[in-house]
Swiss-Prot record:
Alphabetical keyword list: ATP-binding, DNA damage, DNA repair, DNA-binding, Nucleotide-binding
Function: This protein is involved in the repair of mismatches in DNA. It is possible that it carries out the mismatch recognition step. This protein has a weak ATPase activity.
HAMAP family named among the record's database cross-references: MutS
InterPro entries in alphabetical order: DNA_mismatch_repair_MutS, DNA_mismatch_repair_MutS-lik_N, DNA_mismatch_repair_MutS/MSH, DNA_mismatch_repair_MutS_C, DNA_mismatch_repair_MutS_clamp, DNA_mismatch_repair_MutS_core, DNA_mismatch_repair_MutS_N, DNA_mismatch_repair_MutS_sf
GO cellular component: cytosol
Signal peptide: none
GO molecular function terms listed in the Swiss-Prot or TrEMBL record: ATP binding; ATP-dependent DNA damage sensor activity; damaged DNA binding; mismatched DNA binding
Membership in a protein family: Belongs to the DNA mismatch repair MutS family.
Classification lineage: Bacteria, Bacillati, Bacillota, Bacilli, Lactobacillales
GO BP annotation list: mismatch repair
Residues at which ATP binds: G601, P602, N603, M604, S605, G606, K607, S608
Protein name (record): DNA mismatch repair protein MutS
Amino acid sequence: MAEKISPGMQQYLDIKQDYPDAFLLFRMGDFYELFYEDAVNAAQILELTLTSRNKNSENPIPMAGVPHHAATEYIDKLVDLGYKVAVAEQMEDPKKAVGIVKRAVTQVITPGTTIDTANSVDNNFLVAIDFKAKRYALSYMDLSTGEFKVTELSEFSAVVGGIASLKAREIVVGFPLDEAQVKVFERQMNLLISEQFEIPENLLIELSGLTALENQAASKLLAYVKETQMRDLSHLQEVEHYEIKDFLQLDFATKSSLELTANKRENKKHGTLYWLLDETKTAMGTRMLRSWIDRPLVSNSAIQKRMEIVQVFLDHFFERSDLIEALKGVYDLERLASRVSFGKAVPVDFLQLANSLSNVPAIKNILEVLDETSLNELRSQLDEIPELSGLINSAISENASRTITEGGIIKKGYNVQLDKYREALENGTSWIAKLEADEKAKTGISTLRIDYNRKDGYYFHITQSQLNSVPEHFYRKATLKNSERFGSQELTEIEEIMLEAREKSSSLEYDLFMGLRAETEQYIGRLQALAKTIAEIDCLQSLSVVAEKQGYIRPTLTEGSRIVEIKGGRHAVVEAVMGAQEYVPNDIELPEQTDIQLITGPNMSGKSTYMRQFALTVIMAQIGSFVPAKTANLPIFDAIFTRIGASDNLISGESTFMVEMSEANHAIQKATSRSLIIFDELGRGTATYDGMALAQAIIEYVHEYIGAKTLFATHYHELTDLDKELDHLDNVHVATLEQNGNVTFLHKITDGPADKSYGIHVAKIAGLPQTLLERADLILQKLENKPLPAKKIADEQEQLSLFDFAENSSEIIEKIKGQNVDNMTAREALNFLWELKDSL
């Protein structure tokens, strides 16, 4: 016979049925309880004691619990690990409930919807994707700030890159994923996948500025958030369309290899461009700076607008110092507004709002003192919101606590009735003191005192030795070992007045605070707009501080130009780490007629640093920053593509060579004449002649068909002869100094090709045994005295070229164009290469 389930457990099971993919925290009195499999798993993850309900039954129910006052800590831990948590609250007072207490889920907290993040600076983006007619829509929002955006993309790879850049932890999918897509999101990107296929009619977004697919994706994201949060989200901004082409395009591989916002070793901020440029003083400014680095501008007018203000701040040290001090007093307005919207704002949050608003006049005044036209727009957007600051300052006590149940929140004078209750409490305290003094005098009991506890209320404390002096109007309340507790009619009357005043005072104060919180909601939009303006001011002062500290200059950017001229350029991050005194600056010159710079030189000599230096300088310039150089004249680039470093993609089963070819293909397919391409040692992942052939073919293809400014570092010295064949290619090399058998890398870029690779010298630096090095040197001398086993690649008649094939050259080119490389497997790609080789 099956065991009968109690009404309480049946209620739990009914609720759990609606949330099978979440841990269900079931409120029971002062605890949140977990049962069955949830209890077993949570006990292990959270290190809770696993016990059981109905221990003596045949099938005891596993159970674990957490105190309600500490629940947030445990919920955060589960969410940080990628789990969902459904919170079921008691919907009525258990003392007044008839039968079982009503319970219901009031919120589902997920990795993408949590607003109480441990790191209050970083965004916490929730993304959603939808698909129709071979097009994707990508929408994202940050519930903790209210940001809500959407765009449409043509390729799945662009979707993946966008999500990776946002560092999202959860994705809402609006269509069934195939197996490969699930693998990418779950295994490679470690995303929690949630589904939202339907859109409730009342949540359908139909904005004219969005495509139908964008409206659909944004609607599904909004529906998911409403379904999980179960509350009005007044802080969510209207969904905003954005275009990838409005920004400098940087794919995830490029951002990773250039270490823009996360270093490759630890995936942390230290040692990145973000780390270097971050002198922001507000949380909003820090988030905005990161978004600027993720999405540099392509509009010269927008870039110059930022640079003008950076220049103003740079030229006015004292005003900038005052501005920095004022910014330090501004709290995270975006997160505070979100907490108000979520109904989670506590008294301290309102004090932070008031303190933040009190600094706005100072910020505004500094911009007025500077009296620069470039600051007019920002100055006009600084809304002091005097109504809100006045409301908070009149209502909230400066000594208010973090909780809303402890009292002491509302200021004296804000509410007449509350003041009366407080007066009664204060009078009661003085009445108690007077009664104690009177009874001491009447009874002659010098040790008599009035105390209070929850059980007995107010009482007279009298020791055992004084019991014979107790007056007749006292009545016994409790007997202890060495003393007794007594009451009196007068003490009881005072107590009743005080308890009523305390209860009513507490209740009224709570209601007043909730009213204040509700009234503040009308200012959320203005707070968010103010936060955005302050964030922008903060970012611009940050760039000016870094420019001054590091000795940067304002670059000249010319729209439509193809001239690159950087004098005394430095790698911004490397210089900051090692110090300006030790860093060797380099010029970078790519005149109108030069598209490709072929860079040769030994390993460890600085080729990669030189190339990264160029890319970082471009990115810095296009976010509006000054740059590390003596002078810099740059075109405006539309995209940067990089292939730097060798690495296998073990998760997707791709070898180093396959990753190289995939990234090279991506650059070749997407680059335009306005792009910057950086290829470092392309072709090293395969056999020497295969690698050399492919490297040359790629150089020729970029030269003939794309015309992008390209830095191509190679260890194939034979490729340096290409400058005789390709009009828009120049050779440069990293200079070395040889003296008495010793080699010094000068880290200086010089015109012309390198004549040696110095591989054995690099091995010596690495500490290989001397005997081994001497043997290697001997072998090298023998090899250098032998003729090459095949004709030199640069021999004019035998040169491999995509454009000097025999009669079938156009046929081969058409074959390459006709291949959908994105969908080829590694095996198919290799077979295709062999097929091309056979047809040469």
